C-alpha cells in the first residue's frame, strides 16, 4: 500500500475545518480550471479519463476548493495557448499555471503567493569536472533547449531539439555541453525515460519565474471573496510546505504511470 505523507493529511485537515461559506458568499458553487496539458508533474492528461487533467496543481486547487465547499472540474482544453484562450474568454474560470506578464495581466487576476517557482536549470553529463557558479560559466559552450521553450538568452550559444529526450541523448553523445530545461519537468520526463541517472543538475538556476493560479476577468466566479479565499488558502498551504509535497508525490505518480504498459484501444 502506498504511504501518504502525514504532513499532507495535517494540512488538508486544517483546511477542511474552515467554515463552508462558499454558497452564502461566493457567486458560484463550481469552478472550472485548466492549464497546459503536457507538463508533468504539474499537469497532464489523466490516462483513465483524457478529458480531465491531473497533477500537483490540480491536487492543490482541489484541496482549496474542497475547503471552501466548491465543486471543481479540471478539464483538458489543449496546449498552453489554447488553455489561456479558454480562460481569457471566460468559458473556463481559472488557469492553473499562469506566469506573470503584461498580456496576461490584462485578462487575469493573479493569486498571490505563487504555486511554485519554475526554475530553468542547466543539465550536464553525470561526470566530474564541470565548473559552474552561475549562468556566465555557460558562455562559449554548446547548449540545447527544447523547441517551443520560451527561454532565450543572446549571451548563450543555444540550438533547439525536438524534445527533451533527444536533447539529452545529444548531450550524452557529447554533441552538446548542457541542456536547459525546467527543473521539475526534466525530473519527470527523464525519470520516466530512464535517463535521469545519466545527467546532473547545476545550481544556481539560469533563470526563474513564478507559476500562479489566476482567475479570468470574465469568469462568472470572479469576485473579491473568491480571490481573497484563494490567496488565504495558498498562503496557508505554502507555509505548510504542501505544494512541494504534492510535487514530490506527483513525480512518483507520473513515473508509475510511465512504467505501466499502454492500454490497447
Regions found by a protein language model. Give the residues of each.
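A ligand-binding cleft/hinge motif common to bilobed small-molecule-binding domains
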Residues: 98-107, 178-208
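N-terminal signal peptide c-region/cleavage motif recognized by signal peptidases
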Residues: 17-22
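Short helices/loops that flank or line small-molecule/ion binding pockets
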Residues: 66, 76, 81-93, 165-188, ...
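Extracytoplasmic small-molecule ligand-binding "clamshell" domains
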Residues: 25-107, 250
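Periplasmic-binding protein-like
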Residues: 36-38, 117-121, 193-234, 253-262
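Ligand-binding cleft/hinge of the Venus flytrap
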Residues: 44-48, 61-70, 113-115, 135-173, ...
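Flexible hinge/capping segments at coil-to-helix
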Residues: 124-143, 224
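Extended ligand-binding regions for polar small-molecule ligands
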Residues: 55-67, 127-129, 147-149, 214-254
